[in-house]
């Protein structure tokens, strides 16, 4: 499991690579946030229920519906409309999800060559977009109504992008360069 790998191999390796004197200075993954945005389709209760069901299957815990903060006429949404759902994973469920993401989902993604350094936000957090949520094995292709996209944000306590990239490479994330 990735949690055991982190404690036994990744922490000592990063401690020497980054030149830290204390184990607590080594960066770690704090949480993983999953989000499915539906936009105008969120007002359809059937689509919204399938979104919540699918995200619950992917994450292993119940997601929370997200609502529009303000009305935007160009997007045809009003304040309070449901526009998607999200879930935050921590601890054991986070590590289980990351293991499935690295070893199953990313290799199954179409035209996937690897993650880019440009996907970091400058503070050590990585954002990944999955075009088709059916890449997850938990989703039964026959039971879905629409193929949805999925946003994955991996939040670390790394000081900069380079430390976060080293951390994620130790976990086995495939980077292009």
From Swiss-Prot:
GO terms for biological process: translation. Coiled coil: none annotated. GO terms for cellular component: ribonucleoprotein complex; ribosome. Keywords: Ribonucleoprotein, Ribosomal protein, RNA-binding, rRNA-binding, tRNA-binding. One of its GO terms (molecular function) is tRNA binding. The keyword Ribosomal protein applies. Transmembrane segments: none annotated. InterPro entries: Ribosomal_uL5, Ribosomal_uL5_bac-type, Ribosomal_uL5_C, Ribosomal_uL5_CS, Ribosomal_uL5_dom_sf, Ribosomal_uL5_N. Disulfide bonds: none annotated. SUPFAM superfamilies: RL5-like (SSF55282). Pfam families: Ribosomal_L5, Ribosomal_L5_C. PANTHER family: 60S RIBOSOMAL PROTEIN L11-RELATED. Belongs to the universal ribosomal protein uL5 family. This is one of the proteins that bind and probably mediate the attachment of the 5S RNA into the large ribosomal subunit, where it forms part of the central protuberance. In the 70S ribosome it contacts protein S13 of the 30S subunit (bridge B1b), connecting the 2 subunits; this bridge is implicated in subunit movement. Contacts the P site tRNA; the 5S rRNA and some of its associated proteins might help stabilize positioning of ribosome-bound tRNAs. Part of the 50S ribosomal subunit; part of the 5S rRNA/L5/L18/L25 subcomplex. Contacts the 5S rRNA and the P site tRNA. Forms a bridge to the 30S subunit in the 70S ribosome. This is Large ribosomal subunit protein uL5. It comes from Ehrlichia canis (strain Jake).
């Amino acid at each position: 499991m990735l949690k055991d790998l982190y404690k036994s191999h990744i922490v000592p390796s990063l401690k020497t690579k980054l030149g830290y004197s204390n184990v607590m200075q080594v960066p770690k993954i704090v949480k993983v946030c999953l989000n499915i945005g539906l936009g105008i389709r969120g007002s359809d209760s059937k689509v919204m229920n399938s979104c919540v069901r699918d995200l619950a299957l992917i994450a292993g815990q119940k997601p929370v519906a997200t609502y529009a903060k303000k009305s935007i006429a160009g997007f045809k949404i009003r304040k309070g409309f449901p526009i998607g759902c999200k879930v935050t994973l921590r601890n054991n469920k986070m590590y289980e999800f990351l293991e499935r993401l690295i070893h199953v989902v990313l290799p199954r993604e179409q035209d996937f060559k690897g993650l880019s350094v440009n996907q970091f936000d400058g503070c050590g957090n990585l954002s990944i977009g999955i075009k088709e949520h059916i890449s997850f094995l938990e989703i039964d292709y026959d039971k879905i109504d629409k193929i949805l996209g999925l946003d994955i944000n991996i939040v670390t306590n790394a000081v900069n992008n380079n430390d976060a990239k080293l951390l994620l490479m130790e976990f086995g994330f495939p980077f292009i360069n």
